[in-house]
Amino acid sequence: MQLIPLPAFTDNYIWMVHDERHALVVDPGDAQPVLEALQQLGLQLETILVTHHHPDHTGGVAALRAATGAQVFGPAREPMPEPLIRLTGDQQLQALGLNFQVIDVPGHTACHIAYFCADVDGAPLLFCGDTLFSAGCGRLFEGSPAQMLASLDTLAALPDATRVCCAHEYTLSNLKFACAVEPVNQALTDYTVKAEALRSQQQPTLPSSILLERQINPFLRTRQATVTQAVQAFDASARDEVSIFAALRQWKNQF
């Protein structure tokens, strides 16, 4: 199986998984990059996975379905065009012979879902949409801080080796904020150098890994003393886990 990030718009990635003949894509906000890749690689699109309803994740679905006849899977309780196979957490689906577990991850939107496969060529794979980014997380447009914190806790508990396929190339801006929050984090400092080198060569910083994100991502590290103290310096009223997370997200919004 091959895993490819297809760039779209300014900073989106449409993730494609394919074998020698067939493909699936995740969150195709634009049909054109997918159609070009299918033609170039000689592939048939079988499956479209959607994590949430925002247009930059769904805008290409109708054209791709019309062109290829692909099945479309997406969140059961979000406004999505039919025909759609609607999914909720703890359901499973099979695509390209791979078994995906659906995980409810509300926060960015009210009913956002993620797709986790325990074994793709020997390593787990996560498509997390706009819930988890490298060194960051999605804005809370519909969900609450408590929901997003719980969603991130769920993803952080996945196996260390899980490849994290985020939907946006936000890594450098997220790292700038993360370094402001936790300047003493050597793993964060080291990874910033690596990520800057990748981007200077127009290379993606993704996929990340769950292990790396637990080491560098302040939104997965809100219980670490260094992060807690930094957040409380920003907002002294932040005391419990949820208010600390909420204050951290607000800090990032203003950064």
From Swiss-Prot:
<feature type="binding site">
    <location>
        <position position="108"/>
    </location>
    <ligand>
        <name>Zn(2+) 1</name>
    </ligand>
</feature>
<feature type="binding site">
    <location>
        <position position="168"/>
    </location>
    <ligand>
        <name>Zn(2+) 2</name>
    </ligand>
</feature>
<dbReference type="InterPro" id="IPR050110">
    <property type="entry name" value="Glyoxalase_II_hydrolase"/>
</dbReference>
<dbReference type="InterPro" id="IPR035680">
    <property type="entry name" value="Clx_II_MBL"/>
</dbReference>
<dbReference type="GO" id="GO:0046872">
    <property type="term" value="F:metal ion binding"/>
</dbReference>
<dbReference type="InterPro" id="IPR001279">
    <property type="entry name" value="Metallo-B-lactamas"/>
</dbReference>
<dbReference type="Pfam" id="PF16123">
    <property type="entry name" value="HAGH_C"/>
</dbReference>
<protein>
    <recommendedName>
        <fullName>Hydroxyacylglutathione hydrolase</fullName>
        <ecNumber>3.1.2.6</ecNumber>
    </recommendedName>
</protein>
<dbReference type="Pfam" id="PF00753">
    <property type="entry name" value="Lactamase_B"/>
</dbReference>
<feature type="binding site">
    <location>
        <position position="56"/>
    </location>
    <ligand>
        <name>Zn(2+) 2</name>
    </ligand>
</feature>
<feature type="binding site">
    <location>
        <position position="52"/>
    </location>
    <ligand>
        <name>Zn(2+) 1</name>
    </ligand>
</feature>
<comment type="function">
    <text>Thiolesterase that catalyzes the hydrolysis of S-D-lactoyl-glutathione to form glutathione and D-lactic acid.</text>
</comment>
<feature type="binding site">
    <location>
        <position position="130"/>
    </location>
    <ligand>
        <name>Zn(2+) 1</name>
    </ligand>
</feature>
<dbReference type="InterPro" id="IPR036866">
    <property type="entry name" value="RibonucZ/Hydroxyglut_hydro"/>
</dbReference>
<comment type="pathway">
    <text>Secondary metabolite metabolism; methylglyoxal degradation; (R)-lactate from methylglyoxal: step 2/2.</text>
</comment>
<feature type="binding site">
    <location>
        <position position="57"/>
    </location>
    <ligand>
        <name>Zn(2+) 2</name>
    </ligand>
</feature>
<keyword id="KW-0378">Hydrolase</keyword>
<dbReference type="InterPro" id="IPR032282">
    <property type="entry name" value="HAGH_C"/>
</dbReference>
<dbReference type="GO" id="GO:0004416">
    <property type="term" value="F:hydroxyacylglutathione hydrolase activity"/>
</dbReference>
<comment type="subunit">
    <text>Monomer.</text>
</comment>
<keyword id="KW-0479">Metal-binding</keyword>
<dbReference type="InterPro" id="IPR017782">
    <property type="entry name" value="Hydroxyacylglutathione_Hdrlase"/>
</dbReference>
<comment type="similarity">
    <text>Belongs to the metallo-beta-lactamase superfamily. Glyoxalase II family.</text>
</comment>
<keyword id="KW-0862">Zinc</keyword>
<feature type="binding site">
    <location>
        <position position="130"/>
    </location>
    <ligand>
        <name>Zn(2+) 2</name>
    </ligand>
</feature>
<dbReference type="GO" id="GO:0019243">
    <property type="term" value="P:methylglyoxal catabolic process to D-lactate via S-lactoyl-glutathione"/>
</dbReference>
<feature type="binding site">
    <location>
        <position position="54"/>
    </location>
    <ligand>
        <name>Zn(2+) 1</name>
    </ligand>
</feature>
